[in-house]
C-alpha cells in the first residue's frame, strides 16, 4: 500500500541522491501518507464519539430498566401484602433484570417483602425496594470530552465507575472506544 510505496520511493531517493525527481516523489508520497493518517485519525475520532453516544443511550436504557424494576418491586410488595398472586409481576421484573444484566454486570438479592435489590458487581446499589440510583454520563476532561460512566451518589459530583464495570454492553462499548488499535 501507501506505506510500501513511500519506503520504496525513499529507497530510490537514497540510491540516487543527486537527482531531484526521486526526492520529489518521496515528498509526494510522504504528503499522501500524511493525508491518509490524518483521515484515519479523523475517522477513529468520529467512531469514538459515536460509541460515546451509544454509551449515553445505554446508560439511559439502564436507568429506565432500574426504574421499571423499582416500580415492579412496589407493585409486587403491595399485591403480596393484600394476598394477591404477583407471579406475572415477578416475571416482568425478572425480564427487566435479565435485560439490565445485558447492559451492566449485576447481582440481585430477594428481600423477605418480595422486593429485589439490584447491585453492580462491585456492590453499588442500583435498586433498593422502590428507590433507584442512576448511572450518569459524565463528560471526561481527560478523554477528549467523551463520556465516562458515573454513579449518582446524591452529591454534586458523581463517582466515576467506568473502570468498575466488568461486563455487559457498557463494558463492551468502553473497551471498543478506549482500546488500542
Report the location of each language-model feature.
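Phosphate-proximal small/polar/acidic motifs at interfaces that engage nucleotide phosphates
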Residues: 68-71, 77-181
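Amphipathic, non-membrane alpha-helical segments that mediate helix-helix packing
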Residues: 1-16, 22-76, 89-104, 163-181
Amino acid at each position: 500500500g501507501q506505506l510500501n510505496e513511500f519506503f520504496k520511493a525513499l529507497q530510490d531517493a537514497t540510491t540516487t541522491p543527486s537527482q531531484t525527481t526521486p526526492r520529489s516523489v518521496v515528498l509526494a508520497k510522504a504528503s499522501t501518507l500524511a493525508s491518509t493518517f490524518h483521515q484515519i485519525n479523523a475517522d477513529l475520532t468520529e467512531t469514538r464519539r459515536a460509541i460515546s453516544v451509544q454509551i449515553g443511550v445505554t446508560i439511559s436504557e439502564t436507568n429506565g430498566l432500574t426504574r421499571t424494576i423499582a416500580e415492579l418491586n412496589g407493585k409486587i410488595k403491595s399485591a403480596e401484602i393484600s394476598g394477591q398472586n404477583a407471579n406475572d409481576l415477578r416475571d416482568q421484573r425478572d425480564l427487566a433484570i435479565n435485560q439490565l444484566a445485558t447492559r451492566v454486570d449485576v447481582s440481585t438479592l430477594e428481600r423477605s417483602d418480595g422486593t429485589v435489590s439490584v447491585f453492580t458487581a462491585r456492590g453499588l446499589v442500583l435498586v433498593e425496594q422502590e428507590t433507584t440510583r442512576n448511572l450518569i454520563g459524565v463528560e471526561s476532561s481527560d478523554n477528549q470530552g467523551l463520556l465516562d460512566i458515573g454513579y449518582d451518589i446524591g452529591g454534586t459530583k458523581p463517582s466515576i465507575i467506568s473502570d468498575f464495570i466488568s461486563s455487559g454492553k457498557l463494558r463492551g462499548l468502553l473497551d471498543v472506544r478506549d482500546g488500542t488499535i
